[in-house]
Amino acid sequence: MELVLQDTQKSLTVSNNIFGYRFNEALIHQVIVAYAAHTRSGNHAQKSRAEVVGSNKKPWRQKGTGRARAGTVKSPLWRSGGVTFAAKPRDYSQKINKKMYRGALKSIFSELIRQKRLIVVEQFCIQAPKTKLLVDKLKKITLKKVLIITHLLELNLLLAARNLYTVEICDIANINLISLVTFDQVIITANSIKQIEERLI
């Protein structure tokens, strides 16, 4: 498969087995759900009726008062009572093996190419950590919400993109699958795409 570099118009040869992979929506969904679940702290905690502090005395006698019967002030029906099915701390993380992760990554990159949302450039850098320089450079390429993937993180790019909510910078070691799916377009350097290809073989 041949990819054309947008800045130099050179041709870059990549593996069709990786960047021409079939679209597997179910696998992508499973991996992204697991990825998102892993970020959950899971430290929610509520008290059941057994854990609420208070007297176990019956509030009033069973019959003769005209009021609804009550056996405890800790009842979930009462204010300040326990919760019926109290949430407890739990681990939400799901196991995703390497084969599934690689399959999802290949499927996402292949679909980005098919949808013409992947922009490959020879290199992507700016001379100074100025937001204006980055905006001017992006205007020549795209005006959409964009994810920029570089081989190594550059300080100038990171500082320039800090206050641009439509731009995210990452290196190939920290590719976020959720960002790959949600951003309108992905800009990636030629060196980065070859590194990704080596990892996914």
From Swiss-Prot:
Gene3D superfamilies: 3.40.1370.10
GO molecular function, one term: rRNA binding
Cellular component terms (Gene Ontology): ribonucleoprotein complex; ribosome
Functional summary from the UniProt entry: One of the primary rRNA binding proteins, this protein initially binds near the 5'-end of the 23S rRNA. It is important during the early stages of 50S assembly. It makes multiple contacts with different domains of the 23S rRNA in the assembled 50S subunit and ribosome. Forms part of the polypeptide exit tunnel.
UniProt record, GO biological process: translation
Keywords: Ribonucleoprotein, Ribosomal protein, RNA-binding, rRNA-binding
Highest taxon in the source lineage: Bacteria
Protein name stated in the entry: Large ribosomal subunit protein uL4
One Pfam match: Ribosomal_L4
Assembly and binders: Part of the 50S ribosomal subunit.
